[in-house]
Design a protein with these regions (language model features):
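Conserved hydrophobic/aromatic "anchor" residues
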Residues: 27, 131-133, 161
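Conserved acetyl-CoA-binding loop-helix of GNAT-fold acetyltransferases
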Residues: 117-131, 153-158
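Conserved catalytic-core motifs of GNAT/GCN5-like acyltransferases
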Residues: 142-145, 162-167
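GNAT-family acyltransferases
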Residues: 2-114
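Conserved beta-strand-loop-alpha-helix junction that forms the acyl-donor binding cleft
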Residues: 113, 143-153
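Conserved G/P- and acidic residue-centered "switch" motifs that form tight phosphate/ATP-binding loops
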Residues: 86, 119, 149
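Amphipathic alpha-helical recognition patches that constitute DNA-binding helices
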Residues: 34, 105, 123, 140, ...
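Conserved GNAT acetyl-CoA-binding A-motif
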Residues: 134-144
Length: 167
């Protein structure tokens, strides 16, 4: 059996989900400025179900409501490894979790356009799917995507998603 220090270290490691090049961590108040910038960029939100413009107060209210959400449905900040530092590039999460049918919807926004087309979306979605099945014990993870969002469709297919239907 490990020491209490081992337990503390293990808990700290589990609070962040690490991939090869990305990590998913809790959203912090200082992230709100970047999120506000991204959700008001029509190029970033083109494939998302967001409506422009969004005030900074709206974004702060969104952040303040996170404390009341089911911990399993809190969004995660996406960061990429840049040597000795981590760079915030977007957010993702699990939502509309159905405990009876053990399913949930996934969502992602890579807001930093300088980090587009580098495969981070597929890596993030793979981590989220693994988290859904191994940690949350779900049977099904799904998402919705606009058919014209080709970059996202490719990313989701790389992560193992298959087309079930079109609306």
């Amino acid at each position: 059996m490990g020491s209490s220090e081992d337990v503390i270290e293990r808990q700290a490691t589990m609070s962040i989900i690490y991939g090869e090049r990305v990590r998913l961590r809790a959203v912090e108040r200082e992230d709100v400025n970047k999120f506000h910038e991204w959700v008001n960029d029509p190029e970033v939100t083109r494939g998302l179900a967001l409506y422009l413009p969004m005030s900074f107060l709206d974004e702060e209210n969104w952040f303040n409501l996170l404390a009341k959400r089911d911990p399993r449905e809190k969004p995660l900040a996406i960061e990429v490894n840049k040597g000795k530092n981590w760079k915030l590039i977007g957010n993702c999460g699990v939502f509309d979790l159905d405990s009876v049918n053990r399913s949930a919807e996934l969502g992602i926004m890579i807001g930093d356009k300088s980090e587009w087309n580098k495969g981070y979306g597929a890596e993030v979605m793979s981590l989220l799917v693994k988290h859904c099945f191994e940690t949350l014990n779900l049977n099904r993870a799904f998402l919705k995507v606009y058919t014209e969002n080709i970059r996202a469709v490719r990313s989701y297919e790389k992560a193992g998603f298959v087309l079930e239907g079109r609306l």
